[in-house]
């Protein structure tokens, strides 16, 4: 049985043109929790999707400054994880968990 904390680590899959291109290299892109570490991300992906992870790369996208009705606000920072899977394994992100 999967640990409920794994669902807190993986926020959502990233479906963009660039993330679709890296899927050809056995990589999948996820938005993850800001405080999630690489070992936590690896454990969560392996537990939730039943695949073998070989590498995890992370990047933090800084939030943009936006204006709304004259007030200045700031979007939240987003942490993104590029997960490399073992040869011959894949994840279908279009289906839910």
Curated annotation (Swiss-Prot):
<comment type="similarity">
    <text>Belongs to the universal ribosomal protein uL23 family.</text>
</comment>
<dbReference type="InterPro" id="IPR012677">
    <property type="entry name" value="Nucleotide-bd_a/b_plait_sf"/>
</dbReference>
<dbReference type="InterPro" id="IPR012678">
    <property type="entry name" value="Ribosomal_uL23/eL15/eS24_sf"/>
</dbReference>
<protein>
    <recommendedName>
        <fullName>Large ribosomal subunit protein uL23</fullName>
    </recommendedName>
</protein>
<comment type="function">
    <text>One of the early assembly proteins it binds 23S rRNA. One of the proteins that surrounds the polypeptide exit tunnel on the outside of the ribosome. Forms the main docking site for trigger factor binding to the ribosome.</text>
</comment>
<dbReference type="GO" id="GO:0006412">
    <property type="term" value="P:translation"/>
</dbReference>
<keyword id="KW-0689">Ribosomal protein</keyword>
<dbReference type="GO" id="GO:0005840">
    <property type="term" value="C:ribosome"/>
</dbReference>
<keyword id="KW-0699">rRNA-binding</keyword>
<keyword id="KW-0694">RNA-binding</keyword>
<dbReference type="GO" id="GO:0003735">
    <property type="term" value="F:structural constituent of ribosome"/>
</dbReference>
<keyword id="KW-0687">Ribonucleoprotein</keyword>
<dbReference type="GO" id="GO:1990904">
    <property type="term" value="C:ribonucleoprotein complex"/>
</dbReference>
<dbReference type="InterPro" id="IPR013025">
    <property type="entry name" value="Ribosomal_uL23-like"/>
</dbReference>
<comment type="subunit">
    <text>Part of the 50S ribosomal subunit. Contacts protein L29, and trigger factor when it is bound to the ribosome.</text>
</comment>
<dbReference type="Pfam" id="PF00276">
    <property type="entry name" value="Ribosomal_L23"/>
</dbReference>
<dbReference type="GO" id="GO:0019843">
    <property type="term" value="F:rRNA binding"/>
</dbReference>
């Amino acid at each position: 049985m999967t640990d409920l904390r794994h669902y807190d680590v993986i926020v959502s899959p990233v479906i963009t043109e660039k993330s679709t291109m890296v899927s050809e290299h056995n990589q999948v892109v996820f938005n993850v929790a800001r405080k999630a570490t690489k070992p936590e991300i690896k454990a969560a992906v392996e537990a939730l999707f039943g695949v073998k992870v070989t590498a995890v790369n992370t990047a933090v996208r800084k939030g943009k400054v936006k204006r709304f009705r004259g007030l200045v606000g700031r979007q939240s920072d987003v942490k993104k994880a590029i997960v490399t899977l073992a040869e011959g394994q894949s994840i279908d992100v279009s289906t839910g968990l």
